[in-house]
Amino acid sequence: MANDALSAIFSNPSRKGVQPSTSIVSYTNNEDDIIDVENGKFNKNKNINTNVYVDNSSIEESEVVPLPETKSIWSKIYYDFIVLDKTTLNVSLKESFLYNRDLKPVEEERRCWSWFNYLYFWLADCFNINTWQIAGTGLQLGLNWWQCWLTVWIGYTFAGIFVVLNSRFGSAYHLSFPITVRASFGIFFSMWPIINRVVMAIVWYAVQAWLGATPVALMLKSIFGKNLEDRIPNHFGSPNSTTFEFMCFFIFWVVSIPFVLVAPHKIRHLFTVKAALIPFAAFGFLIWALKKSHGKIELGTLNDYSPHGSEFSWIFVRSLMACVANFAALIINAPDFGRFAKNPQASLWPQLVAIPLFFAITCLIGIIVTAAGYHLYGVNYWSPLDVLGQFLETTYTRGTRAGVFLISFVFALAQLGTNISANSLACGADMTALFPRYINIRRGSLFCVAMALCICPWNLMASSSKFTSALGAYAIFLSSIAGVICADYFVVRRGYVKLTHLFLAQKGSFYMFGNKFGANWRAFVAYICGIAPNLPGFIGDVGAPKITVSEGAMRLYYLGYPVGFFISAVIYLILCYFFPVPGTPVTNFLTEKGWFQRWAYVEDFEQDWKNELRRDDLCDDTVSIYDGTEEKIVY
């Protein structure tokens, strides 16, 4: 009965959506006939005693029996202000979780990203303060400029490969992350990776907002005087921040809220402005720094010592892994923007080339500015914006104040755009997947913004070492998820997915994995195994008191992302070999050959899904593959 209700609710959404003011109405048919809603017509069918749900814009008002009016004020508040999607009122939370319009495959009309769109996307994303600080981290550890830049090239090349791998599922089947993860973790256990990503998006939002406080501080000093921080009494209770710094953070946080409230399809104008202004500000900053240093920069290490031997090797690895860890959330997010690709190649080579190229250019600017600042002031600033602050401290003229203000304004805008696109929108989309009845993207984004105040990002960002620790934390949890997803899709399933089963929880659904909990225990075990080796090193890195961690554990932790990724992938493959999963096109993935991914046609998906939804179980379903001429049944 619930399946019939859910099927009827989502009838014909592409033609005429349910009006928010009228929503869904229901009535019970206890007579001999039942009205069957099909394209706005009413035909009489066999006798069924059930509720029928229709869009009341399709029928005459006189034929509608409205839902009972609620007398309680709390009920009125609940239905009018808390419930968002009225189409889910007459189905359970479980059924609204399975399918809603935010999660369905992207139809051809909305798949409009060509190769150049992906280039623009990464061009806009690479210019932010966080990327500049990644380069500064290598210099802080003792590398010289070219060694640091080499780690950037290698690190972001690996990051690009991971992004492309993780986006293939979304690109081929036009699905977002909350759905793609169901294939490997299970229909309902997929909530755990989604919650992981929500938490990481909130933490990242807080960190990026704290970074946004730096250009805000420079703008205020440009207007009100370079000693503004000294004139504001410090009553902040943490040694890692001051009242002035928190005030700047709060200003950035408040200014962000109106932009978070803008609809996602309208906020694109902010990204357009960002992509146009940021390169001018970045290269202008670079030229200004080189001019002030008379073209002289420190080409050697910026520390008093140069590491050698194994010490150098592990510092090199740490700098390299910081680049990969910086992409941990974006690797998981890859299907969210991969699903809009016009064709299979649109999201492949552009991302593989653009990510290392654009981020290497940005990091090179950060490295040179930091090296020029060291030549000028004899201080190893790990954030290039600290160099900009020194410009203001040493030369407080009209020209310097104007230049610092403009560059700081553009970088604040860059942080705002990056925070919205990479964090608040991602959090909002994931929370929409978890609670479609109560949360839309706007509410989810506001929740992300509110929680950012509780993260205390000033403690995470107190030094470059704490910064790399924060990156490592993101990496060890998200890398295991990515490893399981890639192993399942590329090796176990060989690119084959039965789309309708990803949205069905009946008995026999491939992705319920034979249990009522919709959980793939193999994925859970592999996920834990991927995290476990990195935990001792993580504890040692964050400086837990009275705990001594061996050097070997720390070095394993320095390799955090690939360790988590490959261990979870290997464990998952071993478990799937001895305990095969349903819905695979091959019986032995180690010996049998074949690749079964196809560019999915989803224009009629909703009708196909409704047909499957009406079935009591899916136990007799088979795996069918397309060989280019016809559909063949595997079993």
UniProtKB/Swiss-Prot annotation:
This is Allantoin permease. Keywords: Membrane, Purine metabolism, Transmembrane, Transmembrane helix, Transport. It is a multi-pass membrane protein. Transport of allantoin. The gene is DAL4. The lineage of its organism: Eukaryota, Fungi, Dikarya, Ascomycota, Saccharomycotina. Residues 1-144, 196-198, 265-269, 333-351, 423-443, 488-522, 582-635 are cytoplasmic. It is found in: Membrane. It comes from Saccharomyces cerevisiae (strain ATCC 204508 / S288c). Belongs to the purine-cytosine permease (2.A.39) family. PANTHER family: ALLANTOIN PERMEASE-RELATED (PTHR30618:SF2), NCS1 FAMILY PURINE/PYRIMIDINE TRANSPORTER (PTHR30618). Residues 166-174, 220-243, 291-311, 373-401, 465-466, 544-560 are extracellular. GO terms for cellular component: fungal-type vacuole; plasma membrane.
